[in-house]
Amino acid sequence: MTAIDPQGLEKHTPMMRQYLTLKAQHPDMLLFYRMGDFYELFYEDAKRASELLGISLTARGKSGGDPIPMAGLPYHAVEGYLAKLVQLRVSVAICEQIGDPATSKGPVERKVVRIVTPGTLTDEALLQERQDNLLAALYQGKTGYGYATLDVASGRFVITELANTEALEAELQRTNPAELLYSEDFSEMSLIAAINGTRRRPEWEFDYDTCHRLLLNQFGTKDLKGFGIEDARLSLQAAGCLMQYVKDTQRTALPHINSIVRFNQSDSIVLDAATRRNLELTVNLQGGRENTLASVLDNTVTPMGSRMLQRWLHQPLRDHDIIRARQVSIEELLGNANYEILSEDLKAIGDIERITTRIALRNARPRDFARLRQALALLPQLQQTLTQAAAPHLKYLSQVIGEFPDELELLSRAVVDNPPMLIRDGGVIREGYNEELDQWRKLSEGATDYLHELEAREKQQTGISTLKVGYNRVHGYYIEVSRRESDLVPLSYQRRQTLKNTERYIIPELKEHEEKVLSSQGRALALEKQLWEQLFDLILPKLHELQDFARASAELDVLCNFAERAESLNYHCPDLSTAPGIQIEAGRHPVVEQVSQSPFIANPVTLNNERKMLIVTGPNMGGKSTYMRQVALITLMAHIGCYVPAEHAVIGPVDRIFTRIGASDDLASGRSTFMVEMTETANILHNATPNSLVLMDEIGRGTSTYDGLSLAWSAAEYLAKHLQAMTLFATHYFELTQLPELLSNVENVHLDAVEHGDSIVFMHAVQEGAASRSYGLQVAALAGVPNCVISAAKHKLHQLESRDHGKESCDAQQPLQQSISFSAPTPSPALEALAKLNPDELTPRQALDYLYNLKKLAL
């Protein structure tokens, strides 16, 4: 059987009919079907789970005449398997036994009690603690796109309206959703093809009236005007679909989702998808997280602070007032070194943001409450440090963080110091919190003393030295005697079980005690679970304040982190200016300087109305791309409030950062390297403004020399003359160095290098003026290109240069198409002798003689 057919249920066994009915309700998910101590999967689910999880595929009899493929996994190990499936973007429906097997006629009643999808995770074990886990929904309208994201683990709900595919692509890359819902009428499938975890939803789920009503019900408001989103029709349709999906999967109230924010692209510096990729903000070009800007800047002490920092990196602000408030806060934290004290306190606070959400969803575990108690206990100490702050923003954060003395007192009374992982077996509620619970526990715990007394008494009365009292879940309490002493057992003992070396018995007194003990244990556990549920009710009224406390603590963590990074890495506070331009003195690349084995060479840059474009030339590997990227990264860092790796920086208004650096074939879309390059260039030429920072690196490659040169020249001229964008334009077309002679706002700069014979030393220093040459052959030699190829290339280079200069030499008159000789270069006796020389073994006299001999060989 390869397909599940709910219509033909009558031919299956009762259990399989139950399974198939439940599976039909969750066709796109793996169904974990509880069978005793295992979760079992059948049919195609079993085959898929076997492949994804590496578990055995077997068969479970037949149903409907066909073998049933089956795979199983232990219930106690389910979280590990769920974590693996979530990473693979696979959703799971978990079906539990909710009926009593003892009273059930036919299959035990079962129900799907939990749905785990990649975008709706809240369980600590399934989440990456330092990364947001976003569920997104996308709706396409006639005027653009509506896009909504929700971090279920924090309640952060954001919508935005996007005018075109370029903006949508950038937003998808910025948010990087774990799961994406899209309507069945969505037409731009190439934009979402690379996203794992996409879910196609019926068009009616995006109905505006239904979505609008859903959101009103969630927020408990009469309209959405208070959120400023009433006119965002497309994104409200996306948000409504998303909200319904979360309700369906969580199957509980969602009180932590209590607001919605509209993200306006005009509030932040626009970074398109290519720019985010090329600048390696949080993910490097290979898809990893090492050697990124985040890897250098993120020394936060809380997971929620780390997540906030990454959001800031992808959303640099344009509002100078907010940026300056952050700068002033960092300055004060540095001035009195309070960031060190605050960071120690924040480290102990942990991830309150996600703990608060689990409390709101009523799926928090005992240790979540213990961590919340620990965090609340630290607040007086944290506030004592913050009260010394003069910076207005630090005062504001102190006010928002607040204190929670009543909740701290409650948790201190209610929860033991080191609670178990789960409430299932009790032991969570502290002694003294509830008098009735204490009484039931005493009755239960007193059983142990009684059993010891009974065992000692029976040993003495019977004379059986091996007699002992035991317990198991099947037979309850029993008296165990070795087989060799079983003839001493009194007639009043009733045999319960015979084992290989022992006999087990019961007596009426022990049975009566068992009933009392089990009754007291059961009542104690039931009451403890009831008190546990009441804890949620007592904490939830403070939910909003706890969420604010978490967000403010995360921001304080980021600011303390920026202070630490500034001091540790020698960063300085940039000046924000209303005058256009970017001026950086002794700027450094924040990532390269950390991974470089040699001292980083700092370089300046000046861009203003009189100097809008810099034509950057110099050798391959000379540092052109590094130089350009560092200007963009310093500019971006300045706009998140961070200090920057420069002696001094003045940054004017910036609305966008564009990068056209490097390219590769887009095989999925069937686009060549050159096509990708031209598409990115077109985007820049259509959207750049005088306040945009543009990085253009080596455009025009991948086509003929004259085509490439013409395109590069025209693009540079258009940027400088018509758009007047702040541009760094790196090129190997030396003809472009003539642009400053034609345009007054263009200048030449170059990366310096020193040639020594056939070798080259890169100085990595930016100098005014154009480079004299590109040193391509020297770089090729450094890369290990065979000497014969280098020699042939030198010959061809001389031939080309001779022709270009109109020389009448024999070489110049030879056709360029002539065959190149790749014979090895003639050996040099002088070089061979020099290679065999060990200078440490020579006396001064021998060295002088050797030098004369080398000169003769060279001649």
Swiss-Prot record:
Signal peptide bounds: none
GO cellular component terms, semicolon-separated: cytosol
Transmembrane segments: none
InterPro entries according to UniProt: DNA_mismatch_repair_MutS, DNA_mismatch_repair_MutS-lik_N, DNA_mismatch_repair_MutS/MSH, DNA_mismatch_repair_MutS_C, DNA_mismatch_repair_MutS_clamp, DNA_mismatch_repair_MutS_core, DNA_mismatch_repair_MutS_N, DNA_mismatch_repair_MutS_sf
Molecular functions per Gene Ontology: ATP binding; ATP-dependent DNA damage sensor activity; damaged DNA binding; mismatched DNA binding
Domain of life: Bacteria
Biological process (GO), any one: mismatch repair
UniProt keyword list: ATP-binding, DNA damage, DNA repair, DNA-binding, Nucleotide-binding
Residues involved in ATP binding: 618-625
Family matches, as SMART domains: MUTSac, MUTSd
Function: This protein is involved in the repair of mismatches in DNA. It is possible that it carries out the mismatch recognition step. This protein has a weak ATPase activity.
Entry-linked NCBIfam families: mutS1 (TIGR01070), PRK05399.1 (NF003810)
The family this protein is said to belong to: Belongs to the DNA mismatch repair MutS family.
Protein name as annotated: DNA mismatch repair protein MutS
UniProt organism field: Shewanella halifaxensis (strain HAW-EB4)
Lineage of producing organism: Bacteria, Pseudomonadati, Pseudomonadota, Gammaproteobacteria, Alteromonadales
